[in-house]
């Protein structure tokens, strides 16, 4: 939709379309029962109201015939609104059980609503047509692009957008600060609070002005600062409204197949990035990579884990060939076999923990990490492997400050005639 602009951006209002695809289906009456088939003799009269998608597909207006799917979606959307209201009341009443119930229910309804698009866009559903799925996505793109164009005409900078969200820079005062550092003065705190309120007012105003029946825009959250190295769906920001938390999307801190040392490193680097402390960020990144390269990091912070499938035979043995074409090449399979050999037990589908001890071998040498044993029961770890993996992850961030992954591992930057 709109590629993310690399760098640091202060005071970002994040606007989100409420149940975007279901809203489009309701607003434009999209259904197999309302699609106008151009091959049929009977067509709508010239003065009949119709919905025409950007693709050219036509759907009967609600006044002519209400679609079955839009009817169902309206009921589901009403149910979700009820549960959201229940969540709000539960928060006010400090009722955790009611809050969990309504939150689970609204999420379940959301998943059910979104599944309608998946069915429409599939080829196996009997009552569908390719016009349905393509019309929904075309209207979604149209809505996003139209709002971005209007915002930019008004002089607002859109720094990023995806399927159903828009990140736009708020028109706060030019001297506004976006980062409150420890020991900030009363004047700085007041400056920051004024900027925050200006962002909230801006976000609420934009949401109200650009909402319509088929595309309800909500001011989802406000960020005091937003950072990305320029890759799609990879960004981090400091949320200050309606709650206070760090927002991380697309980076390795969100993945379950990484190791804790990497996650902790990235989180601290995000703190430096959002505070606009580029020099400290680079120095911290260098120190973390060099520490792991020189094997100065405790192995417990380098544990990797993966799920391992297998078929349990009648005799109690495990057959891995049913799930893996070449099981001996899979680290998790070799770890599972090592656990079985040690008499520690293995259940198909469970996660196994391990350490890479020598990545230069093919396949690389791994050892099971066994909690309770000294040093996890391993002989050591491959510092170069972990340093390179860490550098590859955080190098996406440090590149914005002039340092590549290779330079982080080397510990210095290469220079050329063009560097001077």
Segments from the language model and where they lie:
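Intein modules and their embedded homing endonuclease domains
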Residues: 48, 53, 62-65
